[in-house]
Curated annotation (Swiss-Prot):
Cysteine disulfide partners in this protein: none
Pfam families, sorted: Prenyltransf
Residues noted as binding substrate in the record, renumbered to the chain: 19-23, 31, 35, 63-65, 67, 69, 186, 192-194
Single annotated GO MF: magnesium ion binding
CDD domains tied to this protein: Cis_IPPS
Protein name from the UniProt record: Isoprenyl transferase
Function recorded in the entry: Catalyzes the condensation of isopentenyl diphosphate (IPP) with allylic pyrophosphates generating different type of terpenoids.
Amino acid sequence: MHGLIPDKLPRHLAIIMDGNGRWAQERMLTRIIGHQKGVETVRIIVEECSRLGIGYLTLFAFSAENWLRPKTEVKALMALLKKYIASEAARMDANNIRFNVIGNRDELPPDVNKAVQGAIDRTSGNTGMILTLALSYGARQEIMTAATRIASDIASGVLKADDLSETAFASYLFTSGLPDPDFLIRTSGEMRISNFLLWQLAYTEFYFSSVNWPEFTPEELYRALSDYQARERRFGRTSAQINTRS
């Protein structure tokens, strides 16, 4: 038993899945084997989050900066991504999971984009957890894209500068329609957010696990969620104010 309190689970959980290469290196295996093992962990954690009743799960799968990795590794990652999405679409559909992608999809290979769109279309009517993969994603690029679109809309009269608010700005981001993450987990012991959801993480609780992603089990997930449930989220208020409101 995990001992978690259902009513205190994060509505939106985000995970930076780090440590595939490190896990492989420790075992004298190739990096791609580490990524393959990481995909198995994705499958397990996605289904566990859905079972727990978490409404939104966002996974940082491939950053805008990851294109700078060796071409052989990038090619292998794209092939693995295509295979995962194509093979998991039916499983997601059966589990009532809705699939979503954020990032610059135009930079993805056509066959990967085809698999992505197929999974999005197949699961579009589902009402359970929304699984979002961040692919070719960078938060600074996201913010710049939003700012450019806003400037264009103001110039064309679609938007008035005086009407620009935080809510209006957020509607121009890739994550439009998604709530901000309540909880962010990063694996492998690294303590940084690596250009991930810079706007959206303003009041998110962070948790850094020393476990590499391929070894991130449901038990490790429960440990992280238990830590989250023990925290007091204040959103700039005092403890007294929070207790009075509750």
